[in-house]
Amino acid sequence: MNLLLRFVLFCLLLPCLGATAGAQGVSFPDLGTALPGHQDVTYLDLARMVIPDLKAGTDGFYGGTLPIVMRHIEGPDSGGSPPPTSSFPNAAVLDIKTGGKDRLTMLFDLGDSPDSAEGFAVLALYDLSGKPKLLDAVNVAVDRSSYFREPNRLSLGAGDDAVVTMSTHFNSNQGYVGTALIMVRDDRFQLIDMIYTFDENACAYRRTQNLAFQTSGDNQPYAAIKVTVTDATVPGEEDCGDARSEASSHDISVTYRWDKVVSRYVKGSDAFERLSAENAKRF
C-alpha cells in the first residue's frame, strides 16, 4: 500500500485510533525532536535502535532499509519478512508502566511485507531511566496497516499496563481488523490475545463489530480483563430491492484472568474464535 493510501486510511480510522485519546498519551512527535529529560537524544536515535540506517529525507519522511531481527508477537509461525526499504513521517509514541517502572513504547509501520499479505509493524520497548536502551521489539502486524487502538493502554495494576494495537485493511464494502492485547513481563512483550472483527457496509444494512475493554482490580498480581465485542446491524436507507435487514445488537464478551501456574493470562471462553469463524463465512 503506497504512502498516500496509508495516510487516507489513517484519517478514516481516527475515531478508533490512539490519536483521539489524548488522555491516554499517544503522540506523534517528529523524530528529530529531543526526548523529554534527554536533550542530547532524539526519537530518531531511538528509531535507529530498530532501523540502524534510518535517516531524514528531503520530503519530510524518514527512510531506511532492514530493521533488526525480531519475532512476531503471535509466534514463529506468524508474520512475513520486513520490506527491504521503508519510509514514514513519524512514529506513534506511548508511555507505559511495567513492573512499577516507566517505559516508552514506539510503533513503526514499515509498510508491506514482500512475502506476506500482512504488513510489517514494529512495537518497540525502551528504558529511558538512564542512557536510553532498547529492551524488546516485536512485529505486531496481522494485516496491512497497524496502529495503537483506543484505549491504547489498560491498567493491570498500580505499576503495570497492557498495550492495545490494531491491524486493518478495507475494500469497497468490508473492513477487517485484528486487535492485539499485549502485556509486558520482565521487559518483554507477551501476547494476551488477538481478536479478529469484521465490518460490512452493504446496500441493505451496515454491520459493525466494536470493541470495549474493562479491567477489574480484584485479581493479583494482575487485574482481570473483560473484552466485549458489540455486533450491531443497522438497516440501510436505500431501496435495494431486497428485504430490509432488521436492526439488531448483541454483545460477545470474554474475560481474561491471570493464571499463576502458567504465568500468563487465560481466556474464559472461545467466543472470539467462534465469532471469527462465523465472520469468515461472510468474506
Regions of interest found by a model, annotated:
Residues 70-90, 140-151, 200-207, 278-279:
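Repeat-based blade/solenoid architectures
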Residues 22-75, 171, 176-283:
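Acidic, small-residue rich beta-repeat scaffolds with periodic aromatic anchors
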Residues 89-100, 149-159, 212-219:
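Structural signature of eukaryotic scaffold interfaces centered on beta-propeller domains
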Residues 1-9:
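Bacterial N-terminal signal peptides that target proteins for export
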